[in-house]
Amino acid sequence: FAPLVEVPGEQLSVERMGAMSAGIVVSYRRDSAVIVVDLGGGYGGSLYERLKENGIEVRAFKGAEASNRRTDDRKLAFVNKRTEAWWKFREALDPDQPGGSPIALPPNRKLFSDLTSPTFEVVARGIKLEPKEKVVERLGRSTDHGDAVVMSWSEGMNYLTPVVRSKMFNSNKRPVVIRAHERQKAFLHR
């Protein structure tokens, strides 16, 4: 992942938010990367529409939708897409998987905190991720960085462009794993 780009909402006019956001996204987009837009809370719809209208490949992320996937070991289901995305990202970060983790994250304390703060629980329907409101209450801020990374990754390897795929698998650089006891893991690219 490249360093995260953050644009405060107050810099965008409400009337033109979709068009302005699309312009920002396109200006930072590299290697024809697939864009994933959060359609769970209101403001993503106009951004999604502007990108689609211009022929830019974009995927909608709706975290509240039902999930039909299971954990890698096939033992548990997910309560919703949000839980599925966070759990699958967690599985993809596992350095002990064959070949190690293909993910390298930028060194960003806020991102590290966002990715390691939410907890999971097992309920009757499967795995459930802690509600974002509870994480926000505990941290005193939103987990926007972590949400952006997890959502952008949520489409997984199936939607990597050929350019990005060749860079990932033809690079001599591998992620460096930094373990902080049993509590947390961070994956930084050097």
Report each predicted region and the residues it spans.
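Mg2+-dependent endonuclease catalytic cores in nucleic-acid-processing enzymes, primarily RNase H-like
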Residues: 1-127, 170-190
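Charge-patterned, long linear interaction tracts outside catalytic cores
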Residues: 105-167
